[in-house]
Amino acid sequence: MSEEKRKMIAGELYRPNDPELREDRLRARHLLHEYNHSAPDAKAQRQEILKSLLGEAGNAYIEPTFRCDYGYNIYLGENFYANFDCVILDVCPVHIGANVMLAPGVHIYTATHPLDPTERNSGLEFAKPVTLGDNVWIGGAPLLIRA
């Protein structure tokens, strides 16, 4: 694991143009393309893609389209359901409990940027983890960030 990847996952300032991180994002994009373009009845294929993409997938069901940065920082509990257009920017870990339901258009962002313009212009970024407990339902089109 590169030092930049370690810092990213730990919530420290890191450089997102690190070669390993670029490759990880590309891998996720390929898997997401395959997932989002799968046939509506391809449940087994979708589950296999989620198992390859996510840190923990359980028996999740996610309606396409789904987007994330890396995938491996997303940990889903049992009986997770996300409706259309879910976005999880998983720069830091995202832990979601059991029996969680997300309505259409839910966005969960761990990524953020330094507030100081000099630091921000240097290209550094950081993130903070997000955790949702068990039995949560989130209505349509909210933006969840950890500030």
Report the location of each language-model feature.
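Flexible, glycine/small-residue-enriched loop-and-beta-strand segment within the central core
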Residues: 66-76, 81-147
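Terminal amphipathic alpha-helical/low-complexity segments used for targeting or macromolecular assembly
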Residues: 1-59
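Arg/Lys-rich RNA-binding interfaces used to dock onto structured RNA substrates
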Residues: 58, 62-67
